């Protein structure tokens, strides 16, 4: 999960990317998508406390319908959350992890 201008996601199962899983475009709360409510504009307009609460709810929602083994949270706005907020399956990763992950996905497709 990448927290930045919006919310980016990539889902892997058994080490393989599940393509076209645009989770951030799915409805989330009050008629808004994950992308809208977790993006930078929402962080600025809603305030950090409400935005963090929405991030925690989003991670729980993703776990409810994906039942993930682990989730990596990165991006420019990941610095505003703590892994403690999400439990043992969550890891906060540096902003560069999203770029490196994208490169890795590109390599996997070859």
Identify the residue ranges that each predicted region occupies.
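ATP-binding/phosphotransfer module of carbohydrate and carboxylate kinases, centering on a glycine-rich
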Residues: 3, 11-110
